[in-house]
Amino acid sequence: KKSAVVYKGKTATVKATLAGVSSVTYKSSNTKIATVNSKTGTVKGIKAGTVTITATSGKLKATYKLTVKNPTFSLTKSSATIKKGKTTTIKSKAAPAGKVTYTSSNKKVATVTSKGVVKGIKKGKATITVKCNGITKKFVVTVK
């Protein structure tokens, strides 16, 4: 592999293949952006940026470019109006894909399932707090 991507706070393992070699040492060109386990090659993204990971064994050397990206999370829309007894589904995009959690500010007005399905209970407004990748978004639901 000549390049790889890892997200901030996440780890990945990229193995260097040096012909006929069993003992390889790994090094990062900038440990403020990404660290690498010198024996296993497991990299961890520290902050957004690009580094060169070098694998060496004796006189043999291989390098690859590692890009560290900040995780992203967004909602396709931030509000909806529904009738009492009806539902709407909160749709989101996350990179990397991760567990999304939903919490209703007022369960007497609107409830939300673990899959993001919001149900109108009675007239009013509720804010659904949606979290993923350490990022929080708000979805306002108005029940008519």
Give residue spans per PLM region.
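Extracytoplasmic soluble-region selector
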Residues: 1-144
